[in-house]
Amino acid sequence: MAIVTSFRFTKNCGAICVDQESWHVWRRKNWFTDHLYSLIDPDQATRFGVELVYGGVGHPPYHLEVAEKARKLLREHLSRKDLDPAAVTAEKLGHVVLKAFQQVHRRRVDDKMEYLFGFNSDELNAGTFTNCQGTFPIQREEVKSRALKIVHGEEDTGYGPLTPPVEACLIGIDRHYGFSAFCLKEKDGVLGFQSCWFESLGQGRQGPAIRFAKLLNQRFLDSRRQGIGRDRGVFYLLDAISEAMDHYGQDGGFVRMMIIDGDAESATDRLRDIRDNAARLCVEIVKAQRNELLDRETAVDLMTDLTRPEPDIDAVESRFFKAVDDPMRLGKLLRRYKIEEPGLPEQGPEPRLFQADAVQTGAVREGDAS
């Protein structure tokens, strides 16, 4: 996958968004948004008031394995009878995820060394390896040198030559500290705390960083601490992702976003998964606003409706096109036409869908109705 970005909206609310596009042999493209995982079982999340969401960049199977292993470890951890609820925080649970992350890395390293040399990292440290014929010392310097390169990450463990580094962003909420976010990187093997509003990893991470930096530099310290709010935060998060989609390679596929809200009363409201058509329409709304076809407040209102449980996507899309002065121009933009000059497209669905409605409401400019 290409990029993952997290953003804190308020003290108790935030989101994580992925935009994933992969390509093979420089030509074939695949779009997928699978590498965003909710890690806590719903019943345990309700009991302890926590949520944890994991999103990664780099080698896709790595993150799938981490998520499955982390879910198992977290389920066992939260099922302990002697567990103090006061000790259940996003940071504590993050270290459980880190353990799963490290175990997957260690397995991949050991698998490659077992395949190449017949010994694992423990045997490399001991200087001896054991097989069915007995125990033998590891003596060849070229073998030890290459094995150490694999352990240190200087040689890949089965990734493609164009795969970005394996990195992940982890966001969570708990009853004690509210929203927290962390970073995990395969080359470091530590859990890094997100000390500012945002984190961006992967291809094109500079784009969201620039957009968020401009936003934060305009705000006073108290305003930063208070947060920007959930509804506006969703807009700015997707605006930052759009910056990467517009200007950086390997970005531009479908997006998927998970919103976690510590102030929500129900499990449905506490974790919101925005995907497929709703996510696509959100990106189109942001694109219209970035091209000055839609004002920001209207864009925020439309996206707020799209991020509610079971949104009426068709109704929101209809409101979206009616909110712009020139729906035909908007249609050209969304179909990737050049829109330097205004005017109606000769072909396309916009005249049929929106011009008739405009005639009925008297909104068509003179000459356009004909």
Region spans (language model):
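Short beta-strand scaffold segments in enzyme catalytic cores
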Residues: A2-R8, C13-C17, L162-D174, G178-F182, ...
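A mid-sequence, solvent-exposed acidic-amphipathic segment
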Residues: V151-G202
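Flexible, glycine/charged-enriched surface loops at secondary-structure junctions
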Residues: G227-V234, E243-I260
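Extended charged low-complexity segments that act as oligomerization/scaffolding linkers
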Residues: G233, D269-R270
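Conserved short S/T/G-enriched processing/targeting/catalytic segments and their helical context
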Residues: M1-E154, G189-F235, D276-S370
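Sterically constrained small-residue positions within well-ordered secondary structures
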Residues: A45, Y159-P161, Y248
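Short Gly/Pro-enriched loop/turn and capping motifs at secondary-structure junctions
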Residues: S242, D263-S266
